Amino acid sequence: MEVQELFLLALAISLDAFGVILCIGINKGITLKSSIIFVFSFGFFQFFLSFLGGYIGTIFNKYIVPIPTIVGGLIIIIVGILMITEGFKEKEESIFLNKIMYLILGVSVSIDALVIGFTTLSYINNLFYLFMSSLFMGLIATIICSLGIILSKYIKKISIISSYADYIGGIILILFGLKMLFF
């Protein structure tokens, strides 16, 4: 696989993470530390799951491809619903400050990387090249998510978005989840 193809593939699978990180970034209670942890969580899981998928892809490709998309979509929909319900509550702390969310969202936005590993990277026989290709995909996801956090800080300054961030973010996450399930 050429570098340009790998870059476009990495960019494509990073878009879900970008959308989710925007929703996280506009949330009122999110801290800089939490944002950084989410960015690195998303990047790490993009790397790890694409590597894992490539490593065992030829064996399980036929049986597992549809399952990760369904699970990832459902998880993101559930998080979207939780975000909307958080908007109705008077809260002192954001749902995203719960440490388990780093893992849950990191894995759920990276499940497509597992599928890409199964289908696209599984032909790479050299473990070093597979590792480097997966690492490149994780790096691209980290950069894209960093840009999403920066962009969300500007979006958050728009008063109507700031006022309804939980609802907007929740609806966007539900739409992402539905996209993963049906498209």
UniProtKB/Swiss-Prot annotation:
Coiled coil: none annotated. The keyword Kinase does not apply. Pfam families: Mntp. One of its GO terms (cellular component) is plasma membrane. Keywords: Cell membrane, Ion transport, Manganese, Membrane, Transmembrane, Transmembrane helix, Transport. It is found in: Cell membrane. The chain crosses the membrane at residues 6-26, 36-56, 64-84, 100-120, 130-150, 158-178. InterPro entries: Mntp/YtaF, Put_MntP. It is a multi-pass membrane protein. GO terms for molecular function: manganese ion transmembrane transporter activity. Belongs to the MntP (TC 9.B.29) family. This is Putative manganese efflux pump MntP 1. It comes from Clostridium botulinum (strain Langeland / NCTC 10281 / Type F). The lineage of its organism: Bacteria, Bacillati, Bacillota, Clostridia, Eubacteriales.
